[in-house]
Design a protein with these regions (language model features):
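PLP-dependent amino-acid enzyme catalytic core
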Residues: 1-493
């Protein structure tokens, strides 16, 4: 399986090269030349497998340079005892037609673990397959969860360093503490004055600086990404859509072959894009419902075909979705229109004007699979309260956004098909909002809120989140976007 850039289909690379580079030299994103088909017989076979085995089966055709032995080792190591549920990504039924896919049982209590626990194995193996002699520095811009998951995955991995940038005042206190207390001799963390888009733009500019790349190469370094712009991040996410479907069949929620809707809280469009790839591979997915918070640029795009980032930026109760530039949308546009020239034009308009409008034909294709909705913080807390009162089920703010959007989608469309809400984070990562949602008092700070939520609900907090206030803070720096390149340069000296 080869890959090429969304902005130049003549730039062809292997899977190992795509994972090692992260971002194409022209600024585009790598996409597979074809999508393998999963037959009904293969899907039935997946139902009898463990999560680790399902991961090997789904990823194998995308990684033709990797042996089954390698993939089996990678998945066993990535999805092992560091997950506190043997199912890895368990499906929890709420009622006859609604289930929650819990993707937060890993070491950082967020769905990013599903990809970032295996990415270090894929990346280090890819570097060897490419004959790369230089060391790699992983650059990450995070809206909260990716940063900690990437730090945890790459901490003390030989031949690597990792530097994470997060928006100052743009993550929860628990997310911040998780990052700034990270252990490891090869890690660093810095806040950026601004929002996530400022941090992400800064990282992209560093990747696009050829003179800086040449200077680093002279010193034996090159840069790569652990954000979902890297295909090695996105590929493992396809797996859990297949796994959720199999678990829905095994649990009697649906029959084999029935369509299943998925509702996905997303900001950068990577999580829901993985679901779209799964559908294209043959998974019986009905609608993919994109759930946004007040930064509803994706909802507007799905409804109108116009992507316009020229709007106020809102800091919300679901900070991991506080994003106005959704990088992975570029992959969907390429896959649907098939023209690198057209996609490059859209991306140029976005850079220069902050907006673009797709053709009516392209919007019609998008609307065949995607629906969209959004909710505000008050509605988010109301949904947290409803899930707790009616079902004694505790959900975080991002999951609550998706739960609200599902109810609105069903009410507006009459589509009562079984649906899975993708639950992306432990409720204990956003204790203040969760406490307010269930009627508790949130007049405390950070780890004290974890203890208070445990007391209020009689649910134990995940082990990785306990004792954060007792860990030494290692990283306290804050820089402007213009200083990010200098920060990377100093880190690699």
């Amino acid at each position: 399986m080869n890959y090429f850039s969304t902005r130049d289909h003549q730039h062809i690379v292997s899977a190992a090269q795509a994972i090692a580079c992260g971002l194409a030299p022209d600024g585009g994103l790598f996409v597979p030349e074809t999508l393998p088909e999963v037959s009904a017989q293969q899907l039935q076979a997946l139902c009898g497998m463990t999560y680790q085995q399902r991961a090997v089966e789904i990823m194998r055709p995308f990684l033709s340079e990797f042996s089954d032995e390698e993939l089996t080792h990678f998945t066993a190591a990535a999805y092992g005892s560091q997950f506190d549920d043997a199912a890895v990504a368990p499906l929890r039924r709420l009622d006859d037609t609604t289930a929650f896919l819990e993707l937060w049982h890993g070491p950082t209590c967020a769905f990013k673990d599903m990809a970032l626990q295996i990415l270090p194995y894929l990346l280090t193996a890819s570097l060897k397959k490419c004959g790369e002699q230089r060391q790699v520095c992983i650059l990450v811009a995070t809206s909260g969860d990716t940063g900690k998951a990437a730090l945890q995955g790459f901490a003390d991995v030989p031949g690597t360093k990792i530097l994470v940038f997060y928006p100052y005042s743009g993550v929860s206190e628990i997310q911040r503490l998780q990052m700034v207390t990270q252990t490891g001799s090869n890690v660093a963390v810095s806040a950026v004055r601004g929002n996530f888009d400022d941090a992400q733009t800064g990282v992209k500019q560093i990747f696009g600086d050829k003179a800086f790349a040449d200077a680093l190469s002279q010193r034996g370094w090159f840069l790569s990404s652990a954000n979902s712009i890297n295909w090695g991040r996105l590929l493992p996410q396809i797996v859990y859509y297949f796994s959720a479907y199999c678990d829905a069949v095994n649990g009697g929620m649906i029959a084999m072959g029935d369509e299943l809707n998925f509702v996905v809280p997303t900001g950068n469009f990577g999580d829901i894009l993985a679901g779209w790839y799964a559908k294209q591979m043959g998974l019986p997915v009905g609608k993919l419902v994109c759930a946004s918070n007040a930064n509803n640029v994706l909802t507007d795009f799905i409804h109108t075909g116009t992507y316009d980032k020229n709007r106020p930026f809102h800091t919300t109760a679901s900070p991991s979705m506080d994003i106005l530039v959704s990088s992975n949308l570029e992959r969907l546009l390429y896959s649907l229109c098939g023209s690198d020239t057209e996609v490059a034009g859209y991306m140029q308009q976005l850079r220069e004007q902050g907006r673009y409008t797709v053709s009516d034909a392209l919007l019609a294709k998008i609307s065949e699979t995607f629906a969209g909705g959004f909710c505000n913080d008050i509605q988010t807390r109301e949904k947290i309260g409803r899930a707790w009162r009616d079902h004694r089920y505790l959900i975080d703010t991002h999951t609550a956004v998706a739960y609200h959007v599902l109810d609105e989608y069903r009410r507006e469309t009459g589509d009562a098909a079984p649906a899975v809400v993708v639950s992306t984070a432990s409720p204990f990562k956003f204790c203040d909002q969760v406490l307010r949602g269930i009627g508790g008092t949130a007049d405390a700070f950070g780890p004290e809120l974890i203890r208070r939520l445990t007391c209020e609900t009689q649910i134990d907090a995940p082990a990785p989140l306990t004792g954060l206030d007792a860990r030494p803070v290692r990283f306290g720096g804050c820089v402007d976007q213009s200083q990010m390149l200098h920060t990377v340069d100093e880190f690699l000296k």
